[in-house]
Amino acid sequence: MKSFEAHVSIVMPVYNEAACIVPVLSELCRALESAPRHEVVVVDDGSTDGSCELIAGFAASHPCVRALRLDPNAGQSAAFWTGIQAAAGDVIVLMDADGQNDPADIERLVAALDGADICCGYRARRNDTLSKRLASRLANAYRRAVLGDEIIDTGCSLKAFKAALLKPLQYWDGMHRFLPMLASLRGARIVQIPVSHRGRMAGKSKYTNFGRLMRTIRDMRGVAWIQSRTRHFGVVTPQPNSNRDVD
């Protein structure tokens, strides 16, 4: 999939990011100027700080931006899933709304789908506190031990998917952390590339390290159960034996 030849949908969940959402969207739209067919689906997850109004105002002057809102707040998985289902593109790129993902990496993610169904970004040089890096390292190690997958950085939201593999996945709270694994159970081919990681443009994280780790471990048990019950098989149409006489 060479560069931006595909119709690309960017899906971005937002929760209380009034301090940075407009500059984040402005930077994203500039990065997408070389993509002839693109859209940005912004899903406000019941924000209470005026983010929704800022998004609606930005969308009014930028035709490529579509604004959706969840009411009440339903969580990051619900916001991602809503945007995924609304996306019109052949390729869906997921990213955060706090400015930590660099939209300049999107073109490389999309290009990598030429030989794969999913391209996961991993933060080669993390701009995080030591406690966050340690918590992430622990979660990734535990995940690899339990699920046996090879995803380097599950906490990096910047990922590109072929829409045909992503849209059929069933929604459940917490699923956004396991989308590559869930798609791989349907035969998806995954590649990974390094991406930039920056500090927040403004505002503060909505998660605590311990809370995120505990939820991930809990959800991982459910994914492991799904994985253990998955069987891969093919279906063929039986043909009559041409060597036998038919009365």
Q: Model features per residue range: what roles?
A:
Residues 1-4, 148, 172-247:
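Hydrophobic helical membrane-anchoring modules
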Residues 1-130, 164, 168, 191, ...:
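Structured catalytic core of nucleotide-sugar glycosyltransferases
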Residues 11, 56, 81-84, 110, ...:
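Conserved protein kinase catalytic domain
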Residues 20, 130, 134, 209-212:
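Juxtamembrane loop-helix boundary motifs flanking transmembrane segments in multi-pass membrane proteins
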Residues 73, 78, 129-132, 136, ...:
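Short-chain dehydrogenase/reductase
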Residues 86, 112, 145, 185-186:
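Conserved catalytic core of Hanks-type protein kinase domains
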Residues 116-167, 218-222:
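Short, flexible, basic/aromatic active-site loop/helix in glycosyltransferases
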